[in-house]
Every structure is written in C-alpha cells, then in structure tokens.
Amino acid sequence: MGSAPSKILEDLLDDTNFDREEIERLRKRFMKLDRDSSGSIDKNEFMSIPGVSSNPLAGRIMEVFDADNSGDVDFQEFISGLSVFSGRSDKEEKLRFAFKIYDIDKDGYISNGELFIVLKIMVGNNLEDEQLQQVVDRTIMENDVDGDGKLSFEEFKSAVETTEVANSLTLQCDI
C-alpha cells in the first residue's frame, strides 16, 4: 500500500467516526456503487443506495456529501458524509448536516427562500404554496433571534434541538 492511500486512510480515521475495519467495508461498498469505476459516485449511482432513491431529499443529501461541488461524490466525501449518520456522531454533527440540507447556497444561513424550497421538496403538493409560505414565514419569524430575516446555525439548532431530528439522522446499518 503506497503512502497516498495510507495517508487518506489515516485522515479518514482521524476525521470520521469509523474504525479501520468499517472504512474497509465501506470502501468495498463504494467500489460496488461506482459501477463505471470512475473513482467517484455520480447521481445515478448515488440514487442506487438502498433507501436513498425513495427519499425526497436525496438530491440535497448528495449535494451535501459533495463537499467540493464537483457533481460527484468521491470516496473521502462518501465516508465523511456517512460518518454523520453513524451512531458515534454527536448531536451537533447531525444537526450541522441537517442545517446544510437547508443551506442551499452554503452561505451559513437558511433564508426564507431556501427553507421554502426544501420544505416544498418534502411536502410536494400536499400544501398549497401560499400555505407553505405561511409556515416558512412563521418559522423564520419565531426562530430568527437576531432579526436578520434568516436562520443561523445556532438559531436553527435552538429551533430543532427539542425535536427528534438528531435521532432520525442515525442509521442502524450493517455496513
């Protein structure tokens, strides 16, 4: 094994919630998902992960995994993204991931428009746009402590910390 792969492995061991054996199992899983052997997972390959294609937020999840905005998820991004869902990640990590789902433009805030877009993805046509906009406006108004019209991570965290958001972001999976 060369120094580059072992450096990557050491970085993953330091930066994620996985041990060496788990990373190796995930590497094998990644290689199966990477059907064209490109070294990264494209959107179609990502959608083939069990349970992902049925998730309305699958596209946003992939965008959050894709830390370098390349349009594909490489092995390091795959492991880093999955690490958040492990039972060993803390509530703060899970909430930060959830925040990133809403923070579409990655500016560190959830705007009214971003909240609307993500909630629209989740509710589909079950709510009229006007009703959904009322929910969005009320959510921002009730949780925007500093009055800047958008939610910071701390404001988001305060709004959701009493909910089961963090628990729902834990996967009990056989990796």
UniProtKB/Swiss-Prot annotation:
It comes from the Eukaryota. Ca(2+) 3 binds at residues 103, 105, 107, 109, 114. SMART domains: EFh. Ca(2+) 4 binds at residues 144, 146, 148, 150, 155. Keywords: Calcium, Metal-binding, Repeat. GO terms for biological process: calcineurin-mediated signaling; cellular response to pheromone; conjugation with cellular fusion; intracellular monoatomic ion homeostasis. Ca(2+) 2 binds at residues 66, 68, 70, 72, 77. Coiled coil: none annotated. Pfam families: EF-hand_7 (PF13499). This protein has four functional calcium-binding sites. This is Calcineurin subunit B. The gene is CNB1.
